[in-house]
Amino acid sequence: LSTEVAVTEHDIVAAATGRPHIELTTEAAQIRELRAAIEGNQLPDLYVTSGEVVHLERVSGDISTPLGLPDPPPLPYAPSVLTSAGLASLLARHAYAFQVRTRTRKGKNGESDETIEQEIETVPSNRVLAAVLAGRYWPGVRPLHGIVGSPVLRPDGTLLQTAGYDAKTGLFFAPKVELPWVPAEPKLLEVAEAQKFLCETLLGGFPWVAPADRANYLGLLVSNILRPYVRTLTPFGLITATTQASGKTILSEGIGLLYGQRVLPWPETESELRKAITSALGEAASVLVFDNLREGTVIDSPNLALLLTTPEWSDRRLGTNTTVQIANDRLWLGTGNNLRLGGDIATRTVLVRLDPKMPHPEERTGFAIPHLDLWVKDPANQRTVLRHLLVLVMDWIASGAPRAEHVMRQFTPWARAVGGFLAHHNIDGFLANVDEVRAMDDEDNEWEVFLGQWHRKFESKPKTAAQIRASADIDIDNHGRPHDPWEGCFLADERGGVPSAKSLGRTLRGQVGRFHGPYVLRRGEDPHRKIATWSVGCPDGP
């Protein structure tokens, strides 16, 4: 028994030209045909992300800068959600969509009428195109989990270094610079050269405050390569200095230009920050930098704190009422002078500090690479840095990828992997400046001072908010001079004065059980008056 499959003329032409031929008949048939073409990967460069079909294409042109210099796009490719217009464009360029129209030619001189069929190239109506794209289930369409501009480490420990789509990870590798192949087991000489170049030649001239700052920077530098392997979030990288021209932007560009960056201004409000985050995550940039924050800025943002600990960012798509969900698979950096931290940001931050200890740091010498600010912008030099970094990564993998014992809240897998990588290459000091990070949290410092004075005055005796507030009233000593019984350590309200008992009670409720230094606030209840009482505990005290 045999079955014959009819081969049409259009099948033959489609095979010869590489363009599928799609006959457009009824609307229902058109929807089925076009969905089949998408699910059968007959149209190029289509992928699915979070249930939406996206088209991945090259980015043309540069962004003009105020100086007229080109600012290249973060990555040479970018995805966009496929719209009706986008699908029509793809069909026109990569398929032959047609309708068959018939007309009758009247016969002359007694001849019979002639029916003529004619193919008309066309595209479906907007209603059909919208119906095709309405679904969220796309079997057969390759998932796109992200675009990377450098080789990355797959979950199995192999290095993705072939340009294009990688089925093992769902990533599309769009190289920013061409690299020679990196072996799975680099030679010892290669490893030694890479260590010396990165630690001495590239970074040796920076005025690090302590070894921890250089180690933390190298940890941030390697994070994008390790991300698919470690499969975890990365903390906020804060690069701060005592004065301008210390090298902050060179360091941030050293990371961002390697992987593809977008530089952002620091928004003034939480709503503006949320919009900036959503917009930035929609771009094909692996590193997002809040550059040159105003000196002394206190980074205390609930939205940033949420972003750093959520693998998927959810927000309303700009200009619409629809919600967009975007993978938070980026490295976030901030730079500025004498920056401070507040809220939950300190526990989500890796600190890099610079202190040139001179009045005009722009005049200093000693860099092994002259004009380093220009050097890092050259793709050939980015290739050099990336090659050395990858050699160290593969040497670490070849040695079993040993982990360190660091603990860092939600970022512990990242800290253990990066710490192990650095320790393997004898780079000391990673995360050793945690105390300095805590000291940058002004709010935490204020609470520690307040609770410490409370504990010295009342030990762990329960007090009501009204009693605590009354204890802050200014006394007059025997010489008629005002005396502050709290010695300036009491909490202040928004106007800088002492808060009311009611306001103080509300403030205390938000701090129950949270340690500030060695002190912790506890809540109780007066059994007779049925009102809240407060006490301060200390591990070294009662």
Where are these regions (language model features)?
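N-terminal nucleic-acid engagement/recognition segments and initiation subdomains in replication
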Residues: 1-212, 229, 276, 280-282, ...
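AAA+/SF3 P-loop NTPase mechanochemical coupling elements
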Residues: 277, 281, 316-335
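N-terminal pre-Walker A segment at the start of P-loop NTPase domains
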Residues: 211-225
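Glycine-rich phosphate-binding P-loop
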Residues: 235-260
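DNA transaction DNA-binding modules
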Residues: 240-243, 261-262, 274-278, 286, ...
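Pre-Walker A (Motif I) flank of P-loop NTPase domains
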Residues: 232-237, 285-286
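Phosphate-sensing "switch" segment of ASCE/P-loop ATPases
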Residues: 163, 170-191, 200-201, 326-330, ...
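Conserved catalytic/switch belt of AAA+ P-loop NTPases
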Residues: 301-324
